[in-house]
Amino acid sequence: MTHCCSPCCQPTCCRTTCCRTTCWKPTTVTTCSSTPCCQPSCCVPSCCQPCCHPTCCQNTCCRTTCCQPTCVASCCQPSCCSTPCCQPTCCGSSCCGQTSCGSSCCQPICGSSCCQPCCHPTCYQTICFRTTCCQPTCCQPTCCRNTSCQPTCCGSSCCQPCCHPTCCQTICRSTCCQPSCVTRCCSTPCCQPTCGGSSCCSQTCNESSYCLPCCRPTCCQTTCYRTTCCRPSCCCSPCCVSSCCQPSCC
């Protein structure tokens, strides 16, 4: 018998209805065409396992990771969906790390496996955050809102100590600023890699004013000096000439 509307199964198999090309494999029904296509009434559920129930995922075979985002709770059966379910829309309106779907995602039952990395669900009213947001240890509620960190996230009330997000790519750090940070990013004591290396520079540090390691900018103006330069305690102006301090002066 001819195909009803190739590619699809034989009319006797699919009840005169053309199948979708992304549906069931033909291995379980010998009368189907070679193209992977069959209605659920033709093919047994084991055709494309693991997957969701055909009525949940629009009669198409589901991905091996589980259900489609449009699946409902009845879709995520333990036999067809593996944890986590319906990723990567964990924090949307679909599944959340378990075998059941729901409108609220990051419930306490999901824990840290819900949509890591993100804030703990008990910290942000079941709202998950992006990877560049808060640390899992929780911050102040005013730090993180919606799906991104506010500029205050890396301030004094959250993820201390760190620089302003505009300097450090919104990542809280235990050390200090990135080389691209400006002076206002660093509070005393704070290190400027381009200024003082592993030493902490003063709050008035200007990364364009001197090199590693160097004298204080108030001692030697804005001239870069060599490693055999002046001591941080300052020296008289004759010590700093050309591009290097005289050891005898310091």
Swiss-Prot record:
Quaternary structure and partners: Interacts with hair keratins.
Assigned keywords, A-Z: Keratin, Repeat
Xref: PANTHER family: DOMAIN TRANSCRIPTION FACTOR AP2-O3, PUTATIVE-RELATED (PTHR23262:SF28), KERATIN ASSOCIATED PROTEIN (PTHR23262)
Family of the protein in this entry: Belongs to the KRTAP type 9 family.
Gene source species: Homo sapiens (Human)
The protein's name: Keratin-associated protein 9-1
Source taxon at top rank: Eukaryota
InterPro entries per the UniProt record, alphabetical: KAP (IPR002494)
